[in-house]
A protein has these predicted regions:
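Active-site-adjacent substrate/metal-binding segments within catalytic domains
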Residues: 1-103, 117
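Acidic-histidine catalytic/liganding microenvironments
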Residues: 83, 111-112
Length: 117
C-alpha cells in the first residue's frame, strides 16, 4: 500500500516536471489518490478495470461478455463521478474493440454527458 505521504511526494514531482494529467491504468487506484488529484490539481484519465491482452477483440465482440463489460464501466463511473479531477473515462487497456465497448461507451455517454470517453 502506498501511503498518503508518498502519493503527495509523487504528485509534487509530477508538478515540478510540468505534468498536469495521469492515467489510472489497468485498475482503479486508491480513493485517496483521486482525492489528492482533486486537491492538488492533477487531471485524471480514469480507466475501467478491463484488460484482455492476448484476446484481441474476441471478448469485446461476444454477447456473453456484455454484462461484465457494462458492470466494469458502471462501477467505475458511479464510484468516481464526483471527482472533478476526472476529465476522461477510459474503457480499458489493450482490450480490443467491439460491441461491448460500444455498449460501455453508450452507457457512460448517457450517464455523463460532460466528460469525454
Amino acid at each position: 500500500t502506498v501511503s498518503e505521504e508518498q502519493m503527495r511526494k509523487e504528485i509534487a514531482v509530477m508538478k515540478r516536471l510540468n505534468f498536469n494529467a495521469v492515467r489510472t491504468s489497468h485498475y482503479p487506484n486508491a480513493v485517496k489518490w483521486y482525492d489528492l488529484c482533486d486537491e492538488l490539481g492533477i487531471y485524471l484519465v480514469d480507466e475501467a478495470n478491463l484488460e484482455t491482452h492476448g484476446y484481441g477483440g474476441q471478448l469485446s465482440a461476444s454477447a456473453e461478455w456484455t454484462a461484465a463489460y457494462l458492470e466494469r464501466a458502471t462501477r467505475m463511473v458511479l464510484r468516481d463521478k464526483n471527482h472533478p479531477s476526472i476529465v476522461l473515462w477510459s474503457l480499458g487497456n489493450e482490450s480490443g474493440a467491439g460491441a461491448n465497448h460500444a455498449a460501455m461507451h453508450g452507457w457512460i455517454r448517457e450517464y455523463d454527458k460532460i466528460r469525454s470517453v
